[in-house]
């Protein structure tokens, strides 16, 4: 008889998150802000790198940016920050397994989302006013990404959001279940690289993209860059991410491991 490591990890994660949230919402907010900020740091560095390498080999920035961005997720998982999209998997699985209530899951997800955004806004403001972004234009890499995203239909954003959070939670499950530290890192980087390269929609990554551009000198040159359209995009992305991470990753893995003592994760 073999016990499920997946279930024990889910139970531990749910208890840890619920305990911190209940005992100190301020501390939970800080961990959530770190997650939004870490992704903004790697987004900012990757976008500048993409612009520089595009001058040498046009189009090559598309390959460089995802690699630099992926380190932001690595920082999150290794440094215990609270990311809403991974919490969608943990908490949905936990609710199905009765380790946490559905109401508390919804409450934590919304709170985490808010402070992921605040962390991204603070970091985004800083980078937008830094020397590296002083000459940002409509033709810069990050401007093009934001304009492309905001031009997408709800249906496409939903699909891209589902796909993104399947990739993200492949990374998270690999980090949780794989023993070797080096293997954990490369599995995380590989899955994140893929979703970013494919331009899938991830709510916290979009917080980072949009925050940097919003506070930059290029903001007024971006088509459809207005609050209603941004909120539309974020709302649909959130739903897509929940479907991908919660319903298509967390829920199935919880079902596969529940009441099993042989074929378990």
Task: Describe each model-derived feature in a short phrase.
Residues 1-265:
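Alpha-helical transmembrane segments and their helix-helix packing motifs
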């Amino acid at each position: 008889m073999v016990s499920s490591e997946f279930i024990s990890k889910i139970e531990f994660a749910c208890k840890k998150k619920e305990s911190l949230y209940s005992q100190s919402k301020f501390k939970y907010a800080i961990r959530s802000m770190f997650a939004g900020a870490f992704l903004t740091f790697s987004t900012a560095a990757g976008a500048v790198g993409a612009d520089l390498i595009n001058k040498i080999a046009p189009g090559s920035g598309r390959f460089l940016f995802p690699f630099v961005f992926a380190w932001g997720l690595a920082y999150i998982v290794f440094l215990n920050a609270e990311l809403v999209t991974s919490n969608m998997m943990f908490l949905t699985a936990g609710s199905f397994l009765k380790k946490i209530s559905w109401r508390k899951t919804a409450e934590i997800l919304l709170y985490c989302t808010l402070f992921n955004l605040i962390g991204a806004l603070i970091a985004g403001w800083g980078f937008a006013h830094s020397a590296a972004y002083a000459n940002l234009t409509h033709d810069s890499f990050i401007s093009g990404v934001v304009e492309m995203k905001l031009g997408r239909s709800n249906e496409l954003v939903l699909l891209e959001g589902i796909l993104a959070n399947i990739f993200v939670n492949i990374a998270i499950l690999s980090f949780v279940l794989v023993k070797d530290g080096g293997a954990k890192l490369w599995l995380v980087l590989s899955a994140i690289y893929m979703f970013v390269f494919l331009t899938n929609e991830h709510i916290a990554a979009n917080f980072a993209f949009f925050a940097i551009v919003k506070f930059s000198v290029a903001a007024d040159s971006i088509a459809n860059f207005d609050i209603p359209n941004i909120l539309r995009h974020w709302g649909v992305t959130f739903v897509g991410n929940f479907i991908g991470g919660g319903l298509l990753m967390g829920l199935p893995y919880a079902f596969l491991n529940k009441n099993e003592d042989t074929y378990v994760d």
